């Protein structure tokens, strides 16, 4: 018993806490205020009980949960975080407790007031002594020498200035208090009530957890505990903290109620004492930065700006210094470092956007307070422009919609704050102007899901908020406003990515009239920057969406070059696994070759054309497979409104086998009968017919919960496989397909809703083929005999198409793409050219007029002998109408 007591006593005496070198006293001379910062690390197994802290002979002890009292009767605010807590013990009363070896390893005691005594010359160091109590024995004094730092003046910035100036706050309050009708049917008073309820819950919660309880954070938040596994716990933690900081501070800004500012302040002071704002146990892209630092920096910056008037001088100093040393400096340093991941946005696009936008917002907040802020801000601006330059000028985003919305919405906040405070408008960058179309074209017909290629979820459709709102309010993109109306994300609080509840009131204008893209936008669009093509029949709930991808390899990609998905009236008959399932080729709608999937590799789209009755895309996925000399080209012809022809040609220097796979959404039923497959779901049907000159077998299975059909084609060194997809809701919408395979071409006869037709896929470009009285030298050509005495011709990558009776339908001086409709009263032609071209179009007689879409007449030459109108057209997309 005595031995045990002696060991305990020895432990208490022999292992005092260690005071780390950054401990100091900061003298804020203009305020005549001193801030004592004591940073502890405890190495022993035993608790240390600190009853008093003595500075220059003056003792300070705990008065209550917020203040110390000196033996001179002065009251000083204090903070105890991390390894240090305050509790009452029977023998010691209310005391600081510095815990033993268990985590966290670090802790702080910070207090401020008039502390340093008058000196003839300012001291460089001061002795700080801790009075440690040990049972009934006399107290032990632990002396430490700490440096004294003198700050002559702390520049005071103008606050608030992030999103709202002081003069704009009354208008914000008025907007929230007054119910006004608007085209979006958004009620700001109702939304504010939801947000205030959230803030009220933040006032009283004692903890939150992340990743289904994998880690708990008790509030106010100490630095999270260390963890042995390489998992990004801090990403979830930082997002949750950002949500609380922004929500509490916004409610304070609007209501002026101090309790919200006090709660936000307590979080900020605790976070300010963390050793760093990026997880030390997660191996991220860089040693100093990850998603967490971006989230914490932005949340701390916005809260600092909005509750600024509730902070005393010491609190401003503590938070500002942390924002600089733990948020700005690590991101700024890593951005400028040679070979850093922040030198190249494509290494990790979403991570780059989060870190740089966090740096930008923090720098913007400190303008006027630190002379370095201009340099930091300019760096953030230059780097975010570099990021936008690397994203698609056409609006395409490489990592899929979950990360596209995450990165771009986060960036939009920084850009909007920059615009509001500095007048720098980066929303006119091509990426920011065009990404709304990437979103709009990707939305499922029923508006309840979105294209989920790469690491993306179907419900990412509800994650798009700020980018779309700011596109509408700043660039007058009424289609973006329509999308927000479709998803309804501004009619309620959706914490997508967990942190963005406050942005209903920032950059969103409910008075802009939405514009439905139906009938206004082309129904299909190419996003060449990422290798995506999206075909649609429109934006009604009864429409079809087909998406195809074959592009460069990148972050968060799947091994699925030449993949496709199809949504018919809300049903994903051809489905992607998204973020929840495998990234392997087997889980996607593409080919296995010799039973094996793809490896990472840059692939490309090699052809695209869209028109009113036929769309086309071609992708070369050869480089995705580790087989020397392999060629895999997939071509898709969309015969509107509901027939898709998918034509695969695989060549190799040796005999190979392939497996053609297509998955459907969970709950789909699949029936296979020979070469025909019927998929049913929610009273909708898709019929799949397949054909090949090689023999093949069929099977069914599932990748986790996604059922699939699989066709295994016998080995050959030149394999052709044709699949037709025909989604329907009625028997009369079913198409019929027959195909013939020849050495140089494939002939496909079909019937569809629009009539009967022919498609020819040629292996010999530039070689004239004649079938069923039409001839062409194109890669693909054909016709549809419409039910309304209308003939429709198409030529894809060719120079000449001769129609029935050998008359010229269309001739290009250089190869092009065209779709021609011939009726009694007019000939219309949709054309895509890669270079300037003289184009001759069939006209049975001299036209009354020739004009391009929009009504502008264009000059032409009419050849009565050839019955053609010739026009000269520049590269690009053209719609020509010949009035007869």
Task: Give each language-model segment a name.
Residues 13-40:
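Extracellular carbohydrate-recognition regions
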Residues 339-340, 366, 403-574, 714-721, ...:
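Carbohydrate-active enzyme catalytic cores, enriched for enzymes
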Residues 56-65, 121-146:
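Extracellular polysaccharide-targeting segments
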Residues 1-14:
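Secretory targeting signatures
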Residues 54-55, 61, 65-83, 89, ...:
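CBM-like, beta-strand-rich accessory domains located in the C-terminal region of large
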């Amino acid at each position: 018993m005595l031995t045990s007591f002696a060991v305990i006593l020895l432990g208490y005496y022999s292992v005092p806490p260690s005071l780390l070198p950054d401990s100091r006293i900061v003298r804020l001379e203009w305020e005549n205020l001193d801030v004592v910062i004591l940073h502890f690390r405890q190495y022993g197994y035993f608790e240390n009980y600190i009853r008093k802290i003595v500075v220059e002979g003056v003792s300070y002890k705990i008065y209550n949960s917020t203040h110390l009292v000196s033996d001179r009767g002065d009251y000083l605010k204090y903070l105890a975080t991390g390894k240090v807590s305050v509790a009452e013990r029977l023998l010691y009363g209310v005391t600081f407790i510095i815990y033993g070896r268990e985590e966290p390893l670090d802790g702080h005691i910070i207090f401020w007031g008039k502390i340093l005594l008058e000196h003839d010359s300012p001291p460089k160091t001061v002795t700080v002594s801790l009075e440690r109590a040990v049972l009934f024995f006399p107290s032990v004094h632990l002396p430490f020498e700490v440096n004294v730092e003198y700050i002559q003046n702390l520049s005071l910035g103008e606050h608030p200035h992030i999103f709202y100036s002081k003069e704009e706050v009354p208008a914000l309050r008025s907007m929230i208090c007054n119910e006004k009708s608007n085209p979006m049917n958004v009620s700001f008073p109702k939304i504010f009530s939801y947000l205030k309820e959230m803030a009220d819950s933040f006032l009283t919660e004692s903890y939150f957890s992340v990743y289904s309880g994998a880690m708990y954070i008790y509030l106010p938040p100490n630095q999270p505990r260390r963890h042995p596994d390489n998992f990004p716990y801090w990403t979830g933690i930082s997002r949750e903290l950002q949500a609380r900081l922004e929500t509490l501070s916004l409610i304070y800004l609007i209501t002026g109620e101090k309790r919200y500012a006090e709660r936000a302040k307590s979080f900020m002071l605790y976070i300010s004492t963390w050793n760093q704002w990026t997880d030390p146990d997660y191996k991220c892209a860089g040693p100093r930065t990850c998603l967490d630092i971006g989230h914490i920096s932005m949340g701390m910056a916005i809260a600092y700006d909005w509750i600024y008037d509730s902070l005393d001088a010491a609190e401003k100093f503590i938070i500002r210094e942390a924002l600089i040393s733990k948020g700005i400096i690590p991101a700024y340093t890593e951005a400028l470092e040679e070979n850093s991941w922040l030198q190249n946005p494509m290494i990790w696009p979403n991570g780059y956007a989060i870190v740089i936008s966090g740096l930008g917002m923090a720098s913007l907040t400190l303008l006027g307070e630190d002379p370095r802020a201009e340099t930091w801000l300019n760096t953030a601006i230059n780097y975010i422009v570099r990021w936008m330059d690397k994203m698609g000028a056409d609006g395409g985003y490489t990592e899929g919609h979950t990360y596209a919305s995450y990165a771009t919405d986060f960036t939009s906040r920084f850009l909007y704050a920059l615009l509001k405070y500095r007048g720098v408008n980066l929303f006119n960058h091509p990426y920011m102007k065009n990404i709304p179309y990437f979103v709009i074209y990707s939305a499922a017909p029923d508006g309840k899901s979105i294209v989920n290629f790469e690491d993306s979820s179907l419900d990412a459709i509800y994650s798009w908020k700020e980018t779309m709102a700011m596109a509408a309010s700043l660039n007058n993109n009424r289609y973006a406003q329509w999308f927000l109306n479709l998803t309804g994300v501004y009619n309620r609080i959706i914490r997508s990515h967990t942190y963005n509840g406050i942005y209903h009131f920032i950059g969103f204008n409910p008075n802009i009239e939405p514009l439905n893209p139906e009938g206004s936008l082309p129904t299909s669009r190419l996003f060449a920057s990422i290798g995506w093509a999206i075909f649609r029949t429109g934006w009604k709930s009864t429409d079809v969406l087909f998406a195809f991808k074959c592009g460069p390899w990148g972050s968060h990609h799947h091994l699925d070059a030449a993949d496709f998905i199809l949504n018919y009236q809300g049903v994903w008959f051809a489905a992607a696994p998204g973020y929840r399932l495998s990234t392997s080729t087997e889980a996607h709608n593409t080919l296995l070759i010799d039973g094996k999937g793809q490896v990472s590799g840059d692939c490309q789209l090699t052809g695209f054309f869209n028109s009113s009755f036929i769309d086309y895309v071609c992708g070369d996925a050869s480089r995705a497979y580790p087989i020397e000399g392999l060629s895999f080209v997939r071509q898709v012809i969309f015969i509107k409104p509901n027939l898709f022809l998918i034509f695969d040609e695989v060549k190799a220097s040796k005999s190979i086998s392939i497996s053609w796979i297509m998955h459907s959404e969970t709950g789909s039923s699949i029936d296979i009968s020979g070469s025909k497959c019927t998929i049913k779901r929610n009273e909708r049907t898709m019929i799949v017919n397949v054909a090949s000159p090689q023999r093949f077998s069929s099977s069914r299975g599932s990748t986790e919960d996604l059922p699939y059909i699989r066709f295994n084609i016998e080995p050959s060194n030149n394999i052709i496989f044709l699949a037709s997809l025909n989604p329907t809701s009625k028997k009369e919408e079913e198409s019929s397909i027959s195909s013939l395979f020849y050495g140089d071409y494939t002939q496909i006869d079909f019937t569809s809703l629009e009539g009967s037709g022919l498609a020819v896929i040629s292996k010999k470009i530039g070689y004239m083929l004649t079938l069923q009285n039409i001839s062409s030298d194109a890669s693909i050509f054909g016709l549809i005999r419409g039910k309304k005495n209308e003939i429709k011709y198409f030529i894809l990558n060719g120079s000449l198409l001769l129609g029935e009776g050998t008359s010229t339908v269309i001739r290009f001086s250089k190869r092009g793409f065209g779709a021609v409709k011939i009726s009694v009263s007019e000939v219309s032609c949709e054309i895509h050219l890669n270079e300037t071209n003289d184009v001759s179009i069939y006209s049975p007689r001299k036209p009354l007029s020739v004009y391009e879409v929009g009504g502008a007449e264009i000059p032409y030459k009419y050849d009565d002998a050839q019955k053609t109108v010739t026009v000269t057209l520049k590269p690009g997309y053209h719609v020509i109408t010949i009035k007869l």
